[in-house]
């Protein structure tokens, strides 16, 4: 039995390719292996930006937290518990102004929690605690950012890989859908390439 967490974040709704392919992967894995699938749609239910109550509350002993801190920390704990319970995480991210959406950034701000999802080991080096999980990261962009002149402007893929790794999620497979704004034929080819990659993932996943 496999527990799957699907996190989508694109505000494009039904037009979102990152949401489409992330959902296909999550549902395909569930169909193959069984288990539970939990979906967290950050666009439909955006997490709040972090506040002073959260920043102070997360390092305050539970019994000493103010009501505002209790409320702020409770949401972060809910997000963290969902990640901890998952064996597989499928994350969909559509590029917004060269980076991930603010909704997804807010989610990472909540789960990046000192003493809970990361700590510090020898020589003060950070060590993530959310280890032993597989992550499928689906990124979408209208242009081509994996190579060429626009590659230096991709502040989405590397950023998300770093944030995942910081909390211990280092087994990350990236699925890109890009180059969809260069006309119908280019979009068709880009989508077909991603469809083939998704099929391969579902056929070979262990």
Swiss-Prot record:
Coiled coil: none annotated. Its EC number is 1.6.5.-, 1.7.1.17. The keyword Translocase does not apply. The keyword Protein biosynthesis does not apply. InterPro entries: Flavodoxin_fold, Flavoprotein-like_sf, FMN-dep_NADH:Q_OxRdtase_AzoR1, NADH:quinone_OxRdtase_FMN_depd. Binds 1 FMN per subunit. Its cofactor is FMN. FMN binds at residues 10, 16-18. Pfam families: Flavodoxin_2. It is an enzyme of class 1 (oxidoreductase). GO terms for molecular function: electron transfer activity; FMN binding; oxidoreductase activity, acting on NAD(P)H as acceptor; oxidoreductase activity, acting on NAD(P)H, quinone or similar compound as acceptor. It catalyses: 2 a quinone + NADH + H(+) = 2 a 1,4-benzosemiquinone + NAD(+); N,N-dimethyl-1,4-phenylenediamine + anthranilate + 2 NAD(+) = 2-(4-dimethylaminophenyl)diazenylbenzoate + 2 NADH + 2 H(+). Keywords: Flavoprotein, FMN, NAD, Oxidoreductase. Transmembrane segments: none annotated. PANTHER family: FMN-DEPENDENT NADH-AZOREDUCTASE 1, FMN-DEPENDENT NADH:QUINONE OXIDOREDUCTASE. Belongs to the azoreductase type 1 family. Homodimer. Quinone reductase that provides resistance to thiol-specific stress caused by electrophilic quinones. This is FMN-dependent NADH:quinone oxidoreductase. It comes from Azorhizobium caulinodans (strain ATCC 43989 / DSM 5975 / JCM 20966 / LMG 6465 / NBRC 14845 / NCIMB 13405 / ORS 571). The lineage of its organism: Bacteria, Pseudomonadati, Pseudomonadota, Alphaproteobacteria, Hyphomicrobiales.
């Amino acid at each position: 039995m496999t527990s799957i967490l699907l996190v989508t974040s694109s505000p494009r709704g039904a037009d979102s390719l990152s949401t489409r392919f992330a959902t296909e992967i999550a549902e395909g894995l569930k169909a193959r292996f069984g288990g539970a699938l939990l979906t967290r749609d950050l666009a439909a239910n955006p997490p709040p930006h972090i506040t002073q109550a959260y920043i102070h509350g997360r390092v305050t002993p539970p019994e000493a937290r103010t009501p505002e801190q209790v409320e702020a920390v409770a949401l972060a704990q809910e997000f963290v518990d969902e990640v901890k319970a998952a064996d597989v995480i499928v994350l969909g991210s559509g590029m917004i102004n060269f980076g991930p959406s603010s909704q997804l950034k807010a989610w990472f701000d909540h789960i990046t929690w000192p003493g809970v999802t990361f700590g510090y080991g020898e020589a003060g080096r950070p060590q993530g605690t959310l280890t032993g999980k597989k992550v499928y990261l689906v990124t979408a962009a209208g242009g081509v950012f994996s190579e060429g002149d626009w590659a230096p402007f991709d502040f989405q893929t590397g950023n998300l890989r770093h944030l995942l790794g910081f909390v211990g999620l280092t087994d990350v497979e990236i699925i890109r859908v890009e180059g969809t704004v260069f006309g119908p034929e280019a979009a068709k080819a880009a989508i077909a390439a991603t469809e083939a990659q998704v099929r391969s993932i579902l056929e070979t996943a262990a």
